[in-house]
Amino acid sequence: MHLALGKGLRRAAERAGEIGARTVQVFVDNPAAWKRRIAPPKGLDAFRERLVELDVRPVAVHASYLVNLAGPDRDFRERSIDVLASDMAAAAGYGATLVNVHTGSHRGTSVSEGIERVARAVAAVLGRQEGGASGYRDVTVGPARASTPTLVLENAAGGGASIGTAIQEHARIAEVAAALGVPDGRLAFCLDVAHAWGAGVGMDNPDEIDAWLAEFDRELGLRRLALIHLNDSRAERGSRTDRHEHIGAGRIGERGVRHLLTHPELRDLPFVMETPGMDEGYDLVNLDRARALIAGETLAPLPPEAFEVKPRSISQALAEDDIDERVAIVAPP
């Protein structure tokens, strides 16, 4: 479950326990801003320790939405590398082992050029992590938090000249990154189910899901599929748009979602839901719907008001009470 942090880190950790989440994803900063914190938020140690007590693992971080590793603008790409490197370094303080990012758009140049840029950016970001920095100035990560997270590239729905719509594009990124010295274990991939649907993959059909997984295994190896974003979709298949919906209530529906949740090749992978209304109690509603599908149950229809809730929040990176007023928020150096 993607945890909203708008009510504070401590409250978010307790919410994970209340709903029985087994894995969580968070933002370490505002995903819609370039500026990054220079010190960890208050409550971070308590947040991390509570998740350990609850045996919530893995913890994943979703990087800034502003990142575009594929674009031709050198300055913008360098800023993207700075922000992604900052988010990766800060992730260690949250106990995160995965940092998920959108690869971005080639902005009308070419897919091959975009792939080359992404691979080089990946190598640059991972090269900065070898020193074990915390991501915050003058703050050192202790031994228990010094492991470097895996960078995870998410598939795209296909709009706006995006890179990563096809499995072959991710495979080529991995190939170029390897040639630049990036070890296989440092770079992995995420399947966002709603994105795949938007890109034209029949995620409502078990046979098409199996075909997608077989192709991924041929091109990259299923060992490199590290994370699944389990989202239904309100968009049309192949629309190249990304519109998340409640579990089993969208166009993908119960059959496809159940097949993913019970697939033997996926049973050990973390599933994260980024569904609507997380701040309004629908985090538990959607988690319970996923559990019901695993149990083979038919889902009850959702009430009309369920479809009027806010989409998943992207701005609530940290609550005000987690921010030390003495600490300025600045752009990465």
Label each PLM-derived region with a short phrase.
Residues L9, L44, S80, L84, ...:
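Aromatic/hydrophobic pocket-lining residues that form the small-molecule binding cavity
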Residues M1-A63, V67, G71-S86, R137, ...:
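N-terminal pre-domain/capping segments
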Residues G135-V139, A171-P333:
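Histidine-acidic metal/acid-base catalytic patches
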Residues L69-A188:
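Active-site acidic/histidine proton-transfer and metal-coordination neighborhood
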Residues A16, H62, S80, A91, ...:
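Conserved, mostly hydrophobic/aromatic
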Residues P41-V61, V118-E130, I173-A179, I252-H263:
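Alpha-helix-loop-beta-strand connector modules within alpha/beta enzyme cores
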Residues G20-R22, E53-V59, Y94-T97, G131, ...:
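Short, well-ordered coil/turn segments that N-cap beta-strands
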